[in-house]
Amino acid sequence: MNPLAQPIIYSTIFAGTLITASSSHWFLAWVGLEMNMLAFIPVLTKKMNPRSTEAAIKYFLVQATASMILMMAILSNNLLSGQWTTTNITNQYSSLMILTALAMKLGMAPFHFWVPEVTQGTTLTSGLLLLTWQKLAPISIMYQIFPVMNVNILLTFSILSIMVGSWGGLNQTQLRKILAYSSITHVGWMTAVLPYNPNITIFNLTIYIVLTTTAFLALNLNSSTTTLLLSRSWNKLTWLLPLIPSTLLSLGGLPPLTGFLPKWLVIEELTKNGTLIIPTIMAIVTLINLYFYMRLIYSTSITLFPTSNNVKMKWQFENMKPTLLLPTLTILTTLLLPIAPLTFPAP
């Protein structure tokens, strides 16, 4: 990528997300989504190779299809209601089409097929942006229209996403695909509570971005893209060994780490609203996530001293620049749950 073009591309991505999130007019929201999509394609092809080109084409085809469905729903709703306001959806078919288009853009099941492939075909930094920043615009639209959404359809998408994200990561050895399936699961948790308490959705999204950013930065620093490369962490950067397992366990929602807090709030809110079966299913399926995270941790731990081969130690020769971002994110990833009672008002 041309260094001169990078500020233009990233500023366009930021502007597109900001326009969509702050707009109450359907056309402006749609324009923001299109700006975001078109500017993100060069980010996916940062390294020009057939795999990244394939990932960019898949991303474009899915996002363009979702945009066409969204525009069709917007126009049909405008013909029936005469309004362009995002919160004024009078036709249930338009509501269903809008929800379907947003689910495609978020990569929710059953429209999830593109997320692991696109994430695998790009770099770790581009994959981080795909799984974090690119979620903001569609979720901001969902946040605005949640009072008029079909709750049953949304919960169906959410439960399917949690199940597919958990089962899909079981047979993976590529870390980017595992994090992509983890993203599908987390999006399911975010949207499941949206009709009942959208503020918990925003909190869940914030925690998810912190956890995923920590995981991607650690893997990028370690140059690990597969389970095999992750198992050689001892020979490269020894100080990452406690960081990566704690981050993965937090992503899985294991107490007392930070990742347990949003799941706890979602289950509590769903239980308050009388939906006991749904949070039970969600909690049980999440154990599958913990299983394949534990498998990654096991593959890393068995290479610790003295069982590892210490003949070729690389960490003595690594000249790493110190950074404050990763330690700060690690603290937020692991230690936010103990201070959670301080953030909620007393009953």
UniProtKB/Swiss-Prot annotation:
One of its GO terms (molecular function) is NADH dehydrogenase (ubiquinone) activity. It catalyses: a ubiquinone + NADH + 5 H(+)(in) = a ubiquinol + NAD(+) + 4 H(+)(out). Keywords: Electron transport, Membrane, Mitochondrion, Mitochondrion inner membrane, NAD, Respiratory chain, Translocase, Transmembrane, Transmembrane helix, Transport, Ubiquinone. One of its GO terms (cellular component) is mitochondrial inner membrane. Its EC number is 7.1.1.2. Signal peptide: none annotated. Its main location: mitochondrion. It comes from the Eukaryota. GO terms for biological process: mitochondrial electron transport, NADH to ubiquinone; mitochondrial respiratory chain complex I assembly. It is an enzyme of class 7 (translocase). The chain crosses the membrane at residues 1-21, 25-45, 55-75, 96-116, 123-143, 145-165, 178-198, 199-219, 237-257, 274-294, 324-344. It is found in: Mitochondrion inner membrane. It is a multi-pass membrane protein. InterPro entries: Complex_I_Subunit_2 (IPR050175), NADH_DH_su2_C (IPR010933), NADH_UbQ_OxRdtase_chain2 (IPR003917), ND/Mrp_TM (IPR001750). PANTHER family: NADH-UBIQUINONE OXIDOREDUCTASE CHAIN 2. Belongs to the complex I subunit 2 family. Core subunit of respiratory chain NADH dehydrogenase (Complex I) which is composed of 45 different subunits. Interacts with TMEM242. Core subunit of the mitochondrial membrane respiratory chain NADH dehydrogenase (Complex I) which catalyzes electron transfer from NADH through the respiratory chain, using ubiquinone as an electron acceptor. Essential for the catalytic activity and assembly of complex I. This is NADH-ubiquinone oxidoreductase chain 2.
